[in-house]
């Protein structure tokens, strides 16, 4: 029991930097879109990627792509890559994977959401407030899909 407590005490997670890596806003049908009744269809795609920069130092990138259509036409497309540099130590591989695949993106999401909201308003469209994302559930789903894919490939071999 003391050994488990000691291992948890040695775990370390620090945010070194949160930064905007890439950004894009396109409104291909403006100003005509401003003349139409606003009934948007919002589609959110997201992805995360991580890589080790040095011993215990990781870059995590959260990519968000928001496509909003109105009357079957694209009103705007907004892409943001929100990055973070994190120092992580004292974690086993499964804990580290969760930290980089769920915990860190959860930290980055509010920054990306604010950037998207700001871009949309600057494009003079109605404000867009993205709902919170459950990165833990997405990560668990990813792990489950990976396990199923591994099982299928093992059965075929």
From Swiss-Prot:
It comes from the Bacteria. Transmembrane segments: none annotated. Keywords: Chaperone, Cytoplasm, Protein transport, Translocation, Transport. Pfam families: SecB. One of its GO terms (cellular component) is cytoplasm. It is found in: Cytoplasm. Its main location: cytoplasm. GO terms for molecular function: unfolded protein binding. InterPro entries: SecB, SecB-like_sf. One of its GO terms (biological process) is protein folding. Belongs to the SecB family. One of the proteins required for the normal export of preproteins out of the cell cytoplasm. It is a molecular chaperone that binds to a subset of precursor proteins, maintaining them in a translocation-competent state. It also specifically binds to its receptor SecA. Homotetramer, a dimer of dimers. One homotetramer interacts with 1 SecA dimer. This is Protein-export protein SecB. The lineage of its organism: Bacteria, Pseudomonadati, Pseudomonadota, Gammaproteobacteria, Vibrionales.
